[in-house]
Amino acid sequence: MNGRFKRLMGLGLIVVLTAAAPASAVTVGKVLSSDKGIVAAAHPLAAAAGAEVLEAGGNAIDAAIATSLALGVVEPYASSLFGEGYMVARMADGRTWSIDFRSCAPAMASYEQMAQEGFKTTGEMKLKLQGACVPGLPAGIREVMSRGATKPLTDLAAPAIRYAEDGFEVNQTFSQICKDNFKTLSENAPDFLNEGLAWELGETFKNPKLAATLRRLAEKGLDDFYRGSVADDIDAFMKEKGGWIRKEDLQAYRAVERTPLQGRYKGYNITVAGLPVGGPRLIENMNLFENFNFAAMGWDDPLRLHIMQEVFLLTASDLSAYVGDPAFSRTAERGMANKEYAKLRLMSVKLGGATTSEDWAAGKGRAGDAPAFEEGMGLSDYLTLPAAAALPAQEQFESASTTHFSVVDRWGNAVAWTQTISGFFGTGYWLDGFFLNNEMGNFWSRPSPEGNGVSDIQPGKRVRTTISPMIVDRAGRVRWVLGTPGAGRIVPTLCQMLIDLIDFNMSLEESINSPKIMSSFNSGEGVSLMEMESGYSEGTIRALEQGFGHKVEIKKFPDLYFGGPNAIERGLFDGRLTGVGSVRRGGAAAAPEN
């Protein structure tokens, strides 16, 4: 690790709390240790909401629900009742489970409907109500509550309602994102603005409409969102403004319990969200990386960074081809997570130089044959089979505006939870105090030849994305609870964190604050593009450019583009919990005082 990176680490040690104090006795900080449970989230008040519930005797499930609802108040640009997501839980007794509350396409959604209304791409709908998918967050909360919550929803929603009614101080992230999206807000949600102006740092933001909606749901039940008065409001708004969602879509929505995907990396067990999100790609990456001795290379070694770049390019194609809603399309979750399949993909990793346009044209941009490994086939058997046709990838619109939080309680129950409305402020339209997602942009803009590709638009289909909440354990004990926003950067960022933690023995704080890289083939110069946060040595950057032939772009550390992990570490020997908030997004950790 070079000296420049060590100097950058100092940025993560300072936290400025500008939010109002929570109602209960909790401690909040950028980095915080506790043996009474802890919450790490993208906003100090959201973390405090979860810690407040822990202090009142609630468990990790209770605290997660309180944190989720609070984020919808303090991060209205990234969280909403009209949002969606995925959570993974590991109970103290070792049981793991997950809830998929991804949004889905409404009944009216189709390529024919797009064409009829003049849309050539799904991205063109992202700031229109046609870009909204049927939301899953309230249904997800309801499902999670049924699996072990000990507190009533009135208690769990109380911190969020208090923040919405009393108001809170606008932080730098809130202000900047509001300014970045001012044109959209002015056109689609002018009453969200502060007398027609963007919200400024230090101003007090209140949301009485959202407080009223939350109180209504807490008293009447979350079903009111899908079948009652809130559903009626949504239905009327969509009909008035030309959106596609109807009350019947809301009534038909269900959150789904899924078996989490399991992987293993150098002695650590990884439990991660599976279909239809980014977990299969994450496990595939780690299976490939397990073949390399990164610790011997060194953290700042250009060969290590080159290998990671090339692996990320390969697995992005597999994500595009094989990760989607299993109720609609052929998927290959088990195949992608198969270590034998990783051996096959390892044969395509270009060690000697950057991937070029010639490599891409020759087939490197195509997915591998992951479906062949779904039932446990070995590499030797596969290599004797006739060659299979690979699938091409399609590009998707995907935004970085998501949020993640992590929870561990005093009993050892752990929750990793990622939620989103896709783009910052979603469609830019808001109703009853919350913004409406624009998840339709995550579907392909044109149908696949077979008509049921993983990201083809189909009514009721859950949209694929890259979110990857995960829990890592060793010898039966939780070690880390991890996750991040960041769209296509989510899986690469989390893989880099795992390598920092396991191969380089970094602390959680060091791992979160270490500079990150991102790979894509969109450099425009015939070679792959490597985007890097500042902090790597100049010699390493020169070697990547001149020795390996990569196009390198440097972004100043810390950059929100690379996500914002909010994570928890459990001491390997003493079991003490340490929570770390993201340096890239003003995150914080909070814990009960008693």
Predicted feature locations:
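Bacterial N-terminal signal peptides that target proteins for export
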Residues: 1-11
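Bacterial N-terminal signal peptides
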Residues: 10-20
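Noncatalytic scaffold domains of N-terminal-nucleophile
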Residues: 25-48, 52, 60-221, 225-227, ...
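Short, well-structured alpha-helical segments that form the helix of a local strand-helix-strand
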Residues: 63-67, 154-165, 232-235, 299-316, ...
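Active-site rim segments in enzyme catalytic domains, especially the processed small/beta chain
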Residues: 73-97, 244-246, 408-480, 504, ...
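Short, small/polar residue-rich loop motifs at catalytic or cofactor-binding pockets
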Residues: 257, 399-402, 465-467
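Internal maturation/activation junctions in enzymes
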Residues: 292-420, 429, 550
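Extended C-terminal subregions enriched in glycine
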Residues: 411, 460-462, 494, 503-560
